[in-house]
Every structure is written in structure tokens, then in C-alpha cells.
Amino acid sequence: MSIFNMITSYAGSQLLPFYIAIFVFTLVPWAIRFSWLELRKGSVVPLANPPDSLFGTGKTRRSFVKLSREILAKARSLFPNEPFRLITDWDFADEIRNDPRLSFSKAAMQDNHAGIPGFETVALVGREDQLIQKVARKQLTKHLYIIARISSRIYLGDQLCRNEAWLKITKTYTTNFYTASTNLRMFPRSIRPLAHWFLPECRKLRQERKDAIGIITPLIERRRELRRAAIAAGQPLPVFHDAIDWSEQEAEAAGTGASFDPVIFQLTLSLLAIHTTYDLLQQTMIDLGRHPEYIEPLRQEVVQLLREEGWKKTTLFKMKLLDSAIKESQRMKPGSIVTMRRYVTEDITLSSGLTLKKGTRLNVDNRRLDDPKIYDNPEVYNPYRFYDMRSEAGKDHGAQLVSTGSNHMGFGHGQHSCPGRFFAANEIKVALCHILVKYDWKLCPDTETKPDTRGMIAKSSPVTDILIKRRESVELDLEAI
């Protein structure tokens, strides 16, 4: 499909002939020129899926969305043990993981159209004060004692965590964001500032941001009024233990409060945390549904530790089999088929002699997760894999769910590894504790369990049918602990 047809298919009769003429005679040649120059960057590295012609990469991009696993597998066989554009072999993971010249935030902002209305959330990742990273590392991790509460309770407090309008936004915004981002990426970068106005998914993002402002802003104003009243009365300032308060504190401490948008911050938390946490929880349930013989040992571990120690962070840490089962599900189905997304901010020469030019984009291949040289029988789900690894000398730390390394980059690797992984890991454990103790489940016969891979992103199957029922008798009353 040509660029012209792509635009008109979205815009239909709304696109006036005047704008069509401008588009055809000015933007199309401009887009072709810049798309071709972009392809030629870093051409010393072989291109795994070259375009069919000079007149755009739309067909190639759409093909990659549907066939990314196949294209990646072909590239591995064509270029064994060497980089191919723009995905490096995993041998370079440790070398590049903490290099400050390789920017994760710039790569994320470029991929997800920072600066285009509706995509404001991705710009938060690139803030110089690292606001969202600080809140994730310092505050979410510190407040694991209330992990049994759902994410919205921690993020927004008790006033909004049950707000149906907000919960709807948190569920739909992430889906709409990635759909809009993927569809907009089908267009050459040079015309995306125009194309987004005609994409229905982008319109949804702009509307959801407007709706979120209407929900969150009144709450923030009420809190500020309470603080002003407390100051006037000479009383202590009220404290709210949620991400709204934490983010404002961090922004003020960094001296960036004036540029801080609390609504965008909340949408970004939802974007970065909720869907990934849900996906790993769902994949773990699917894997255990396929292997129900492992459910009872996990249940026994949970019941024993909670009965002896109650709900504490140390209790969750001691659930080593549960930790291993989740990490094994992440190994078999990571959230992305590649990891360590980076943008090169200045020329870099790797130890192999390969030079990465400024402006180059790269990712690291995630194939070590199913490499038989690293893991025995990698195609087999074994929830004891990392549990047993903990007893091996020098491997205890690396076998933990939250640990990162070049052999398991489910949460990334290096200084840009997921800052909220400690929070997410414990949130998933608490959810599974409740599910294991209170419910039995199994997969429906012949249900589909194959992951849904779109481009780089791999999601747990959205069509898997799970039969679940409440257990008639339970070993422990979790609410009474």
C-alpha cells in the first residue's frame, strides 16, 4: 500500500483536495528522501529485512509486525554470532549495558512519537530528573508492605482506586497507546506529525488524556487546598501515601515541580506497569494450567510460609519455588523478543571493532532465554529450574526473579533495567498467593496458548480459555493474617 493510500484510507472524505495536493507534491518527496537516508545509516551492518523498493518501507514494516519471530530467526541463521541491523548479538549485552552513550529514553521517545499530541506519556521517560525512575526505585519498592492492595490503590490512593471511569482509562489507555504507536510507525517518520491527526487510535489517546485530566485534577486541587489550610492554621501538612504525593515530592526535590504534569505521570505509570504485570501473571497461570502437577507444591509453599510468618516482604522473598515458577514463565515468554533498546548519542567502537554511529538504533537479541547451551531442555516448562539453580555455587543471586543478567534479560539489563521490577514481582506473588489458596484452575480442552507476537512485543495469548472455581475448603484464611 502506498503512503498516499495509507493516509487517504484513514482520512477518507475528510481530507480536502487542497491538502491532498500539498501532500503529494511536497511531503511525499520529502518522506521518500528522509526514509531512504534513514535506511542508509550504518549500512556497514547487514540489514535483516530490506525494503522492496525505494518508495517507502510500509510493506516491510507491516510484514515485521506479523512475522517478527520468523524474520528474527532467519537473521540469526544468516548472521550467526555477529550483529545485524539493528539488533546486536547477546554477546555484547554486558559490554553495552551501562554505557551512558547509549540512551534508552531517547530510543523509547523516538519509537513512540514523543512530541506528538496523545503520546505525552512517553516524554516522561526522558525527563532529566528521572522522576518516574526515582518513584519506582525509592517509593514503590519501599512501600511493599501494602503490596496486597491493587496498583491503583498505591498509585492513586483510596479515593480514586475504585473510580470506574479511571479504571476504564487505565485498562484501555495502554492498549490504545500501543495500537496507535504501532499504526503510526507504519508511516515514514517525516509525515507522522500530520498522519496522527487522522488515525482513530490517536484520537482516542487525546480524548483519554482529556478524560484523565477531568478525573485527577480535582483530587490534586483538593489536596493542595488542604495543605494551604494546614499552613494557615499552623498545623502539620497532611501526608498521602500514594504515587501522586511521591511524584510531587520528587519533582519538588529535583527543582522541576513547575514542569511536572501529575496526570501524565499517572497515565505513564499505567502504561509502564499495569499491562506488563498483568501479562506475566496471566502467562504464569497459563503455564501452570498446562502443567497442573506443579500447582499443589506451590500452594503448599505459600500456605506454610504465610502461616508461619504472615504478610511480610521477607515472606515473599522466601517463596523461592513461586519466584522460580514466575521467572520460568518469563524465560519462556518474555515481554519482548529483543531487549536493551538503545539510541547511540555519539560514535562508539565495540570490542569487536564494530563502530556504532551517532543516531544508530540497536536492541539486543533475547535468544539466550531458549539457548540449550545455557538452559537444559529450554523448550520444557520447569518451574524448579531457578529454584534448583539457587543451590549452585555463585548462582543464587542470578536465579532470583528480579535479578538481571545477560542469560536472562526479562526485565532488561544494566542501568536501564526495569526500575519497578521489585514492586511488580511482589505484586504478582501476592496475586498468585490468593489465587493458589482460594481457587483451582485448568485450561479448557484444545484452547489456544500460543503467545501473540506483534513486532518486538510478545503478549500472552489473549484467547486462552481458563476454567476456574473457588475451592470449597482452604488451608488458610488470608484475610485474617
UniProtKB/Swiss-Prot annotation:
It is found in: Membrane. It is a single-pass membrane protein. The chain crosses the membrane at residues 12-32. One of its GO terms (biological process) is gibberellin biosynthetic process. The keyword Metal-binding applies. Keywords: Heme, Iron, Membrane, Metal-binding, Monooxygenase, Oxidoreductase, Transmembrane, Transmembrane helix. PROSITE patterns: CYTOCHROME_P450. Heme binds at residue 418. Induction: Expression is induced under gibberellin-producing conditions. Expression is repressed by high amounts of nitrogen but is not affected by the presence of biosynthetically advanced GAs. GO terms for cellular component: membrane. Pathway: Plant hormone biosynthesis; gibberellin biosynthesis. It comes from the Eukaryota. The keyword Heme applies. Its EC number is 1.-.-.-. GO terms for molecular function: heme binding; iron ion binding; monooxygenase activity; oxidoreductase activity, acting on paired donors, with incorporation or reduction of molecular oxygen. It holds the Pfam family p450. Its cofactor is heme. Gibberellin 20-oxidase; part of the gene cluster that mediates the biosynthesis of gibberellins (GAs), diterpenoids that may provide a selective advantage during infection of the preferred host plant, rice. Gibberellins (GAs) are diterpenoids and are synthesized via the mevalonate pathway. Biosynthesis of the major metabolite GA3 (gibberellic acid) from geranylgeranyl diphosphate (GGPP) requires 13 steps. This is Cytochrome P450 monooygenase 2. The gene is P450-2.
